[in-house]
Amino acid sequence: MRVLILGSGVIGTTTAWYLAQSGCEVTVVDRQPASGLETSYANAGQLSFGYTSPWAAPGVPGKAVKWLFEQHAPLSIRPTRDLRQLAWLSQMLRNCTAERYAVNKARMVRLSDYSRDCLNELRASTGLEFEGRQLGTTQLFRTQQQLDAAAQDIEVLAQYGVPYELLSPAQIAQYEPGLAGGGAQMAGALHLPEDQTGDCRLFTQRLADLATQAGVQFRYGQQIERLEHAGGEITGVQIDGRLVTADRYVLALGSYSADLLLSLGLHLPVYPLKGYSLTIPIVDAQRAPTSTVLDESYKIALTRFDERIRVGGMAEVAGFDLSLNPRRRATLEMVVNDLFPGAGDLAQAEFWTGLRPATPDGTPVVGATPYANLFLNTGHGTLGWTMACGSGRYLADLMQGRTPEIDTEGLDVFRYLSTRSTRPHREAA
């Protein structure tokens, strides 16, 4: 079976790997000169299998109004003329109930839990290295209210057997001794020991190298223009003015996936959540994070690489704007100085922004479409790397006609389509 994958970020590349391992003839197309150079380039560096939660949560609508007037708010909304922004925000608000939050979080944890197992198997079988650590995430709560609100998340963790440990303020330094050098006061913390860290760009590019050795063809520097279709199937993709054909197609273009589907009559509610990061060279390892620390107040993660600290987070609903906002840099620097003062050289930090492809309910869109030979793998939001291996392997199984190893309920695009939309009949490859 010949498969054409559109997009070579961490999602497209992991999908290519698992399809190649399944015996498919795989080609990956991307506009960049290498894999992992857009949203995967400088994300927060987290593999947050335990800390998997939708942004659409109870209390967020009220907080969003408050955040409009705060300098260091974790979420900001900049209205555009794009009506899809308004529609996406409206759908997100409808998912901010306790009932919808529980359903959405359970779906996300299910996929993340599976993805952890897939990643561990991948590392064991290939020896893939990406400056990774397996020392967990420590989620910091500055207020008792935040600590109390974590109770619902802990219920879901317990339901899925995800290990966790609640920490008193005095216990936090056992996992992150560098925090002792800061002046921030904490009400407590949640430690998730199975979470991991690393450089997503390194992971993506080194996996692309392994995939190339396995026979995958990567075609870089090529512009994907449109999907051609007839009779309920994709007949090819216009790339740099020529038609490229395959037996099956995978759309893994992140925030740009929705535009390509419009000509097919599919309205995919994937919208960019703009995030920022700083990559800081370490000058004092004793003051630096040991693994990943997540500041619940500012939704900012501080992650340790070998000789660098990656500080990332925040979410701007601002369309496809890739400009660098100096106010966001100030927020990142403020959190670093508050938690790990003197750990890194901020003057030498690399400031970056990327567009995370987010759905209104937080769950990605992975699976079949009404077009018999078109599959989607997008909409992972802030958890693309966390869910990448599980999403890629699940999709490879689905496309090969094998029964997936996890419950697929609520993962594909059909949860957003009208009841008149039908799933295409498929035969095993």
Curated annotation (Swiss-Prot):
- Residues in a coiled coil are none
> Any idea what job this protein has?
Oxidative deamination of D-amino acids.
What GO annotations for molecular function exist for this entry? Answer: D-amino-acid dehydrogenase activity
Q: Give, as in the UniProt entry, the pathway in which the protein acts.
A: Amino-acid degradation; D-alanine degradation; NH(3) and pyruvate from D-alanine: step 1/1
Identify the EC number(s): 1.4.99.-
Q: Does the keyword Transcription regulation apply?
A: no
Q: What class of enzyme is it?
A: oxidoreductase
Known catalytic reactions: a D-alpha-amino acid + A + H2O = a 2-oxocarboxylate + AH2 + NH4(+)
Where, in this chain's numbering, is FAD bound? 3-17
The cross-references to InterPro entries, in alphabetical order and at most eight, read: DadA, FAD-dep_OxRdtase, FAD/NAD-bd_sf
> Which Gene Ontology terms describe the biological processes this protein takes part in?
D-alanine catabolic process
* Keyword terms: FAD, Flavoprotein, Oxidoreductase
* Similarity section: Belongs to the DadA oxidoreductase family.
The protein's name in its UniProt record:
D-amino acid dehydrogenase
Does the record carry Nucleotide-binding as a key word?
no
